[in-house]
Amino acid sequence: MQPSEWENSCHRIGTCALTGSAALFASIPGSYVIVNGPLWCYFYAMKYIDDSMPGAAERFYCTQPDQNSLVYGTEKDLINGFEYLKKNGNPERLFVQNNCSISLVGDDIEGIAAKSHLPWPVYGIDCGGLHGSFAGGFSRALSLLVQQMNPLKKSDGVNVLGLSSVYLRGKADAIEIRRLLELCDIHVVSMPGVGDSWESIMKAPEAALNIVVRNELALKAAEDMKSRFDIPYISVGLPYGMEGTLRWLNRIAEAVNSASLKAAEMEIRCRQKRLLHFGNNMKSMWGTLWFDRILFSAPPEESLGIAEALRGEWADTENLTVHLQADTCSKTPAVDTVRVVGINDISIAEDYKKWDGGLILSSSHETERLLRMNKPFVSCHITRPVYDEIAVSDLPLCGIRGAEYLYEKIWNAKLSGHIRMAKT
């Protein structure tokens, strides 16, 4: 693992490849996950996923291989794990994940499973040896699912690739995206990663188009499906803001002949009037929605997409800086400065050192850093981990409903700053 990936996985908002692949596997109902590795890796991945996917922990197991297994192999540990699940679990399918160290041993997972004559299919995956991030693990796992698919008769539907329940409000985002597409008469065949069944995911080759919303999670799988099933794909990112959502739908409609945007556009215009009404009421009392500085620190789609919506539709600022948690070729004129975590760390540290107030949209890692530095700020969480706020409602960050929610959150952040200043 490169030093930058290690830092991102263990000290910032990213996690490891084992967690990424487990996040996809655990999202499929009836699927169990065995972590072939130490308890540390197991507990870390299980807890991280279960926090956003209640009940996932009940379908996790760990082989706990000892030091001898690193030399002689983990066959005994795996067989013990299989026997445990025979007695205590009821999997429809089992995914076995080798952690970094066990990946170096080279055990034939599926061969060991075949000798055990198990009543359910077993799929094995290495989590990258000593190299890999959450996105890399998720991408590798999605490609593994594509390998299990068979050609099917084509329909007019689409697949949405690159969503995960493990992302902040990820399941709610998926529900909103499905709602928007169906509002435009676009049938969704499958959305892996957010609770779709195995049967639904295996129907993905029926689709006439793959919509990739996060390149780092799903571009490789889309390329695989283009090669195997001749399904074209478009990379469109995530829809943020009202106008941003309409542009997003227009891009998809250009590729789907049966799409009709009339109902979606009508809803957007209606909701825009509502936002304008509430926004004008607030401006008359508190002034314009302005921040001297705005800082984003999140994955690429969240950072760039929300930044474009924020500056184009909701608020303004003297300077908007983005710290991307992964590199990307995507760009937006809404951003003044772009830095990449693990590449521009010296400049990122300088940004925090010079910070003297404004809005930060990030995870709790960044807000805690500013607190430790005794820097003034107001905040809005747009990515995990989040330690000082609970997310229970089904409100998304993206789409029409997400635009309303984010506008509300950003206004409330501004108001909380006014209240704190009044108290001091």
What is each stretch, according to the model?
Residues 1-424:
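An N-terminal assembly and electron-transfer interface module characteristic of large anaerobic redox
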